[in-house]
Amino acid sequence: LAKFIKADAALTVSSGMLAGKLALEVLAYQTDCFFHFPDTHTALKVNSSLPFFVGHKLNPRLLDSVSEKITILTDTVPSFRTQAIDLSILNSIPANKEITLLVDESHSLGILGKNGCGIYSDISLPTIKRKIMIASLGKAFGLTGGVIAGDKDFINEMKNLDTFISSAGMNAAFVQTMADAAAIYLQQHQKLTTNLKYIDTYL
């Protein structure tokens, strides 16, 4: 799964919601301030999180001179939308803010990117020090479960988290099904792409 997403490492859990909450639990110890994009899913909700935008402008807190570690929370494709969000605005944040980006790819994994790998691997903004993705596998993959992907250090931290160790894992049969159906997922994604291009020619 990590190879498909093009991440260094990944692990599965019982749901996308749990994936988000576990990732946030680890990041809470490493973050001075959280910021969230509009319409961010509940899986990435933090009570102390500040809005990324105030009005139609960047939150002034993102532009001040305070050196701090911040985590930005967002869906890659928010609910009720069909296009991925534009993350280039993160380049406007000054270098004194050490940025971790946590994205929810529940509505893009299996749909966007090469062969449906999502957009995680395409996020390469110079201002981002660390990027992490979580997703539900119950959308395009049709299997109950969730995934957390990122760099090896972060995933190793996840594996040692007491909450992760004691939580329910993804159904083993579903994990095996996902591996066995790799070729089928690829075929179906190619079919989807072809059908969308066909529809697009008549719109």
What are these regions (language model features)?
Residues 80, 108-110:
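Catalytic P-loop NTPase motifs of RecA-like helicase/translocase cores
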Residues 55-103:
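Active-site phosphate-binding strand-loop segment of PLP-dependent enzymes
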Residues 13, 23-43, 197:
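Conserved PLP-anchoring active-site segment centered on the Schiff-base-forming lysine
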Residues 123-157, 170:
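Active-site PLP attachment segment
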Residues 1-22:
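Short loop-beta-helix segment that forms the pyridoxal 5′-phosphate
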Residues 144, 161-170, 187:
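A short glycine-threonine-serine/GTX helix/turn-capping micro-motif
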Residues 174, 178-203:
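Conserved PLP-dependent catalytic core of the aminotransferase class-I/II
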